[in-house]
Amino acid sequence: NYSVLATPAEGLSGRFTKMDRRKFGKIPGVTDRDYYVNSFHVDVKEPISIVEKIKCEAPFHAITRGGHITYVELDGEAQKNVRAIAKIVKVMHDEGIGYGSINHPVDTCHNCGYKGVIFDKCPVCQSESILRMRRITGYLTGDLSSWNSAKRAEEKDRVKHL
């Protein structure tokens, strides 16, 4: 018996890029950034719709029975648009996604406690001290400050799927 796993390899995505850059030099679109995109995922920089991303990744779920995930990135607070979430889940189901995730920002101002999507500064008190909760592939691991440099670079490059 065997199983194929679409591994996230969170630490390796940055480590292998550095090793390849040393060995092969800086290759545009390959080793010129701090990370490799995990598994069979569409490039995080690719401006693609939610449905397109799901349809592109779905065929790989059937052949990676040992584990897989498809995630989409939203630009707002998910709880404010429950119908959209339900539609995304339905598309994931209909396309055969075995494990799906809907990522959305969860930010909290350390200074005044404001919760919501915060860009550079808190909209209430202008503080730059922000707790930024994000998901790495399939799990939450604390705020961005606990992520390795490769994963922080990837998160910064992630486009929102509309």
Q: Can you annotate each of these PLM segments?
A:
Residues N1-L162:
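Long, C-terminal-biased catalytic regions of enzyme "large/alpha" subunits
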